[in-house]
């Protein structure tokens, strides 16, 4: 079974991320409360953090926001290297090269839920053994009247890493704004 890798100075290559995906294929999630970032489950040992931003108005921007999430453009725009084993749907896995100050880490997740409504689209993914944290994160864009909102929820154990998660959330929010402004 794959274990959490050590931070590295150089970004991982796509080949290294594909190997990380292969090494965690069929692995169990590292937490039990599947769906917790979307309010579908509870866990007493995990803490929720939420970040929301109004992106801008207009239905065309909502469609662009959905496409940016669906295609992993938001993650790439936030500075992550992304290798996924298929489209964003339940059961799909993704390996991420995540920059942290002066180092890079590999994080592997599995999509555990997809939100697909007329006025909302998004997904939640959960951590697999080759991930530096434990828990779940969701990314949902929604249309509320004339606004497009982007909400990120991270449900993880209490940790000193929270400032890094807040920084990551701000990067995702800015990346989505750039994607819809194009």
Show which residues each predicted segment covers.
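General beta-strand recognition
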Residues: 95, 122-124, 149-151
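Compact beta-sheet-dominated globular domain cores
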Residues: 144-149, 153-155
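Hydrophobic ligand-binding cavity/cleft-lining segments
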Residues: 1-97
């Amino acid at each position: 079974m794959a274990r959490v890798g050590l931070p590295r100075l150089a970004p991982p290559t796509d080949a290294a991320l594909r190997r990380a995906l292969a090494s965690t294929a069929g692995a169990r999630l590292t937490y039990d409360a599947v769906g917790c970032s979307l309010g579908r489950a509870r866990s007493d040992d995990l803490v929720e953090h939420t970040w929301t931003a109004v992106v801008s108005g207009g239905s065309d921007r909502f469609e662009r926001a959905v496409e940016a999430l669906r295609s992993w453009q938001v993650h790439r725009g936030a500075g992550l290297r992304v290798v996924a084993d298929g489209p964003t749907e339940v059961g799909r896995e993704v390996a991420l090269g995540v920059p942290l100050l002066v180092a890079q880490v590999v994080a592997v997740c599995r999509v555990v839920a997809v939100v697909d409504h007329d006025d909302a689209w998004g997904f939640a993914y959960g951590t697999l053994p080759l991930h530096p944290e434990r828990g779940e994160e969701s990314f949902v864009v929604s249309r509320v009247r004339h606004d497009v909102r982007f909400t990120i929820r991270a449900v993880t154990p209490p940790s000193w890493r929270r400032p890094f998660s807040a920084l990551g959330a701000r990067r995702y929010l800015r990346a989505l704004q750039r994607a819809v402004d194009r």
